[in-house]
Amino acid sequence: MDSLLRIFPQKRRAFWQKTADSGKWVCEIRLRVDRPVIVETMRGDYFLNNSGGWQEHPYGAHLVTETEIRELIAWLCQDSVYAYADEIRQGFLTVEGGHRIGLCGQAVLENETGLRTLKNISFVNIRVSHEIRGAADDILPKLYKEGMFQNTLIVSPPGFGKTTLLR
């Protein structure tokens, strides 16, 4: 899955190649500073070892560094973090391929207007998008009444396919 591989900086792509090759099974990738990389798949959770291979236990797994997180954020923001300030303030970035990248760090507040930005980002959660053709086929006819599209609210817990349905 090329769009998944392009999330990562060029110099780290060889490390992520196996995960990208298994893209159709990957649901989420979790990167936390000083913690093992976790790859959540449709078949279970795995940890990445230092060569990018998958293993079932965290022992000897690759530990994410602050530098890796910083380089990833810079890459995702095309080296212009300020240009992405609004998205970062929302807590996530959306990248090519529809993948969503959640960010967690230290909140910087701005007077009474709320959150200004995040700094010291230490956790990145990559939600891998999957196109499922025909996902809305059963529900689409129910959204129309006498040829007019009806106001609709789609509600479900995280990870239950709201975005997939809309695609």
Report the location of each language-model feature.
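Hydrophobic anchor at the beta1->P-loop junction of P-loop NTPases
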Residues: 154
